[in-house]
Amino acid sequence: MMLLDLEEKTRVLVEDIVERSAIGSGSIFVLGLSSSEVVGGIIGKASSREIGQRIVKTILEVLEPKGIYLAVQGCEHLNRALVVERELALAKDLEIVNVLPTLHAGGSGQLAAFDYMEDPVEVEEILAQAGIDIGDTSIGMHVKRVQVPLRPIISELGGAHVTALASRPKLIGGARAEYLADPIRKN
């Protein structure tokens, strides 16, 4: 896959998910990324720092002007900890953990987050309002309930399968209750 094509498809994917998930300024968007899968390999076996940099930089270019925070999930070797801006970690009172990601412990996306974020830190867990999973890395543990699957307009990025999640408030009250319009499903 050509790198410019990778950047353009990443931009289209993220813009679509942000729009359909109805998130805005102050929201958190989680990224799960297997650069190994993007290049056609097996998750964790062919990590590419350059692929991680291209994808994370592109996502930040989409999210930052909207005031949306990016959280980059690491692999299971780091217990799926996430890289976020220190400002977010402090504002949300998130548990900061002491680890520096490597290509094979944390992954290319986390390394790129350390390259491109202003003051990156690792946090143990987070509850994001939406996110994208590039390469079947399983982001669900970091997306707030109630999770709503979104079918991305592009289903593969290179060799990686792409899925996405948004979240909505729980519906409570039963048959007599009335609800606000659902901005995700538009019904």
Curated annotation (Swiss-Prot):
Gene3D superfamilies recorded: Hypothetical protein TT1679
Domain of life, source organism: Bacteria
Short name of any one Pfam family annotated for the protein: DUF436
Family: Belongs to the UPF0340 family.
Protein name stated in the entry: UPF0340 protein stu1894
